[in-house]
Amino acid sequence: MKINASVRKICEKCRLIRRRGRIIVICFNPKHKQRQG
């Protein structure tokens, strides 16, 4: 999981989700997992 100041979709399968006030990206590709920090 990468922690970035700005998160964005990398591919078509990435999904942006708000969880506990944080924006996270989940994807079938584990390299695309991101969280806003």
From Swiss-Prot:
It holds the Pfam family Ribosomal_L36. GO terms for biological process: translation. Transmembrane segments: none annotated. One of its GO terms (cellular component) is chloroplast. It is found in: Plastid, Chloroplast. The keyword Plastid applies. Its main location: plastid. The keyword Cell membrane does not apply. One of its GO terms (molecular function) is structural constituent of ribosome. Keywords: Chloroplast, Plastid, Ribonucleoprotein, Ribosomal protein. Belongs to the bacterial ribosomal protein bL36 family. This is Large ribosomal subunit protein bL36c. It comes from Phaseolus vulgaris (Kidney bean). The gene is rpl36.
